[in-house]
Amino acid sequence: MRAKTLWNLVPPVLLIPAAAWILWQEVRPPSRPDASARDRTVAVTATALPGDGAMLGPFRLAGALALASSDTGFGGISGLAAMSDGRLLAVGDAGQWLMLRPVVQAGRLAGVADVRMGAFSAATDKAAMDGEAIVLSPGGRTLISLEQQHRILVFDGRGPPRKPARTMFRTAAAGWPPNGGGEALALLPDGAMLWISEQARRRDGAHVALFTRADGTTVSVGIPGVAGFSPTDATVLDNGRLLLLHRLYNGVESQAAISVVDLSAIVAGGDTAAARTLVRWGRRSQWPVDNMEGMTVAQEGGKPVLYLVSDDNFNPAQRTLLLRLELAAPIPSGPAVPH
């Protein structure tokens, strides 16, 4: 049954406390790692989830885990990047970074190892440390997108971010919704950067994004979304195309979707990308789902694989999921498909 139908069955008197609970989950101050603490090893348990081998669109699920830890700073993961040595580097809502090594056995994700965590921000105000996306630049830097106080932190080195070298601001992002700003960030091979707002939209429904060309000029462009969903992370697929992760979470159910975005029109000077929805899944799918927020492409054995992670909002009713997807078929190209 759809969430809308479920809400229609709830007596109106119960909707007010329910809505307040959902809002509180979104804005409450989360637990966070002590920014003054040294980088530390974190004990994480990984529970295998069903669905191995299940196909959706061009993807095959090759392992899914539910991750948990007694460390109070673990959780709230919002962005994910693949490192050249096979490790994954993530950032979260509480100003923390998390690094781990996926354990792949017989072609499936079987566990995680070498888990470490630390703080990329010494701030104590959530608005000043709300990490949403992370990318590693070919030039040897690490970029983290923050929302609420919309900006991009630039760190020297491709690894755990500790002290930002500089901060990038974009005046056009000042009008983005406080809790719906720069949710997805991508760097193209030529050095161009795409920064996508979660909630700011144009009149045609496309999500507002800022496209910074390699020469440093920045223009506002539109990225088509998936109806009812919000974009949460982006990862470059090949030159001119990227994969975009979307989530739907309303406190009652979670759904997720992946689209492919063709930026060729924007690169050529246009103001709107073409997009096609590849997959969407929910609780009735064979794939596990929660509040999916992080996604990255990694190279394993010379082949691209996709890793997805969910943000549990430091809420015991939610889970931190790590999914590994294989490309079992070519990613389709073509004109935009209505969303």
Short names for language-model regions:
Residues 2-339:
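Sequence/structural signature of beta-propeller domains
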